[in-house]
Amino acid sequence: MASIRESWRYLTLSTLLSPLAPPTRAGDLARRLATDVLPERLAGRLPDTAHAASAHDARALGGTPARIGGARAVQRDATTCGSAALVHLAALGDPELVRWIEDGTAPASPRPEVPDVAGRVDLVASGMELTDPDRRFDAAQRVVKSATSRRAIGPVGWPEGLGTPPWTAARQARFPGVSYRVAPVDDRTARGAAVLAAVHAATTAGIPVPLYTSGDLGRGLRFAVPRHVVLALPQGTDDDAASGRSARPGAPSLTIYEPSRGLTHVVALADLLARTSPLKALGSWSHVVAALLPRPAA
C-alpha cells in the first residue's frame, strides 16, 4: 500500500497524457534537425539577448539577467510567462524583432509579436506608450497572449486568466526552419528522459525549446496541470556564455530562461529527472511536464 501511495504522490498530469503522444528518440530528432533544419544556416541570426549579470538580487538567486534588445525579459503579469517565453523564442531567430524592441524600428514585414496599427491605437488608449524597450517587450507579450488565447478549443477562446495552453503555444511558436509539437514529460520514466534528451539535442542544434513546468498530482490537481513556462535556450548564445555554464562541468546541461524573474539558469539534464523539490530555473516548480519539441517545418 505504501508503494501505491508513493507512486500517486509523484504522479503528474503528463503521466496521464503520455500514452497519447508518439515516442521520442533524441538521436532521431538530432539527426533530423542536423539534416533537415541545417542549423549552420542559422549562424549569425542569433541576436545578442543577454547582458552580464550585475544586479545583486540576480546573483543571490543564482541566475543571470536576460535581456532582449535592451529590455529586461520579465513577464508583464502573472499570466504571461508563456507569452514572454514565446517572444524570447521568436527574438532568438529574428534580428528585426530584436531591433524593434530595442529602438522601435518597424520590421520590413509584419511580425506576429509586433502590434499592428489598430493594436498600437489600443495600447495607447490603455495608457501604454511604446517609448522604450521594456514597454515594447510588454506590448509584444500582450499581442502574443491575445493570439494564443484565440481559437484554443475549436472556435472557442481560452480564458486569458489561465495563461497559455501548450497547444496554442506550439501553434504560435516560431523559429526559422522548424515548427513545434507538444510532448508530455514524466521525469521518472525512460520516455520522459528521452523527451528531455531531445530538448538537449535541439538546443545543441541551436534551436530553443519552451518547457511547461508544474508540481505533483499528489498535492492536488492544481499542482499537476501546467503552471509555468520557461525556455531552454540554444547552446552557444550570449545567454549561455553569460550564465557561466556552472552546472556539472562535462555533463549535459540546459540554459533555461525563467520569465517571472527574467533570469537564466544552467541546469544539469540529470537534475531534471525524478525531481522531488522545487527548482528556481523551473519557476520554483518541481517538474517539467511538457516540452514543445521542434520538428523540421513542412
Q: What residue ranges belong to the model's regions?
A:
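Active-site nucleophile-adjacent alpha helix/oxyanion-hole segment immediately C-terminal to the catalytic cysteine
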Residues: 4-153
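Short, well-ordered alpha-helical segments in soluble proteins
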Residues: 89, 93, 176-177, 203, ...
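Cysteine-dependent hydrolase recognition
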Residues: 151, 155-158, 298
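Cysteine-dependent deubiquitinase/ubiquitin-like isopeptidase catalytic cores across multiple families
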Residues: 159, 167-202
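Active-site signature of cysteine proteases
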Residues: 189, 193-197, 201-204, 212-298
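Short coil/turn segments at beta-strand junctions that form active-site/ligand-binding loops
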Residues: 207
